[in-house]
Amino acid sequence: MPAASELERRTKRSKSRNKISKPIANMLSVIAFSICISPIVYFLIRSIYYLVFHPLSDYPGPKLWAISRIPWNYVNLQGDLAWRIRDMHLHYNSSVIRIAPDELSYTSSTALKKIDGTPPPREFLKCLDGRGIAPAVVNRRRSIVTETPERHTILRRALQPAFSERALRDQEDFFRDHTDRLIAQLRKPQYGVTEQNILRWFALLSFDIMSDLAFGQPAGCLDLVDEPWLGVIGSRVKSIVWYQFAVYYRIEWILKWIMPKAAMEARKRHQALTLQKVQRRIEEERSGKREGKKRDFMSYILGNDKENLSNMDLFGMASAFIVAGSNTTTYTMTAFTFFVCRDSEVYAKVIAEVRDKFASDTDITMVAAGDLPYLKACIEETMRLSPPTPSALPRWVLEGGEEIDGKWVPGGVTVGVHNLAACHVPWNWHRPLEFIPERWLQTKEGEFTHDDRALHARFLMVDIMSLTCFLSSMAMNEMRLALAKLFWNFDISLSRNSGNWWITQKSYLVWEKKPLMVTIKPRH
């Protein structure tokens, strides 16, 4: 009996514990379930808000892009953002689309003027959180690209003397000397036998010119037919989107794992060399050693230094000059060669104009090359069909909001004009996907009357790294002279495998620099 009583007591205690533990277990299950499902519920509620109640909910665009920035980042990392946004504008048949929960893309010249041309105090500030230029600060310093509006104004004033009419005239010797060196190299027998990567030759030319203009000393790229830093710049193009991704999600520490070590070390070497050259150039100016030498950018900047720029300011500007200037001209001249050589009629018109006007190579000067209307039209059409910066450099709408293209946009929204999309949509251009230089020669009513040339003009005035307003005239001078001399001296044809060069290009804020193989034969 005592044993039976003990068994009964144990049974009762066990049942009592089970009664207590069951609610606890149920409660823990509910908590676990809530923890697991709460992110899903949060995502669904947030998605409904973005799609139905958000101020941008009535703008056209893909729904998945409207509820998350993940699609934007994924496509950007693939190098397809410029092409995809162009396709979305065409798909929705709209000049404005929503490309992220808080971002709009426009294609009109009026939007471009509003976003990039509104003066202070309502100026749209550059978006530096990873959607545009990233990172904003390197080694605890901002560049001219990412400076505050106040500091940017100071740097612009300091740059103005270097881009005066007199300064542009003085640049003729720089352009002519290096262009003649390019022609001399291409005339060597070894370069007429095999196919040549014309993009590399244009890169060597542009890098030499920009280095000479920035430091008063050429880099010697054309003489050596090599420049290791060019390869570094090319490899770093793809890293731009990773910088954007890391900065946006505040995980910059991840960059050391995804960036090639060789590229990071080469970048550091280049920065050290650039700083050394800037310091040498400043010392030359102060000691009077530049007396009688050609005037470069630093001659004008240091000779009119009312802003008391530091060595680091000059270093930042010199680096930006070289990267922005060489990128724009290298890509545009390569694309020009592709589009012109792809169309036999256009090619025939270009060489006829150049060769009929000049009896000899020495007759081709910067001024004379500016008097080639068809060549100029081909450059303009190249920059329209394949703009050097195909994506947008977005800006913030200030608190209180702004009206853009007749519709109110709330503060805190990111807005921008994606250049490739704006240049390819049929409401801006007639026959937009065709290379037609004649559209720039039309002076009367005709087929291309309604082309939005104001849009193209604005592109030349606003940022390609915040320097285009200064560099556009210089770049046009360089391109007209170099292309006139090239097509006067040589017969050029695309290689058999170059037909898809343009349409297969990736973009990482700027275009990927894919080789363009051509055959170059001297005329005589």
Curated annotation (Swiss-Prot):
The residues that hold heme are 469
The EC number(s) attached to this protein equal 1.-.-.-
Top enzyme class of this protein? oxidoreductase
Kindly give the membrane topology term recorded for this protein: Single-pass membrane protein
InterPro entries, A to Z = Cyt_P450 (IPR001128), Cyt_P450_E_grp-I (IPR002401), Cyt_P450_sf (IPR036396), Cytochrome_P450_monoxygenase (IPR050121)
- Which pathway does this chain act in? Secondary metabolite biosynthesis
Q: Which cofactor(s) are needed, names only?
A: heme
The record lists the membrane-crossing segments as 24-44
Main location per the UniProt record: membrane
Q: Which UniProt keywords apply?
A: Heme, Iron, Membrane, Metal-binding, Monooxygenase, Oxidoreductase, Transmembrane, Transmembrane helix
GO CC entries: membrane
Q: Where in the cell is it found?
A: Membrane
Query: What molecular function terms (GO) are annotated for this protein?
Result: heme binding; iron ion binding; monooxygenase activity; oxidoreductase activity, acting on paired donors, with incorporation or reduction of molecular oxygen
User: What is the documented function of this protein?
Assistant: Cytochrome P450 monooxygenase; part of the gene cluster that mediates the biosynthesis of alternapyrone derivatives. Alternapyrone is a decaketide with octa-methylation from methionine on every C2 unit except the third unit. All the domains in the polyketide synthase alt5 are apparently involved in alternapyrone synthesis, that is, the 8 CMeT, 7 KR, 7 DH, and 4 ER reactions in the 9 KS-mediated condensation steps required for alternapyrone synthesis.
Q: Which family does it belong to?
A: Belongs to the cytochrome P450 family.
Write down what this protein is called: Cytochrome P450 monooxygenase alt1
What gene is this protein a product of?
Answer: alt1
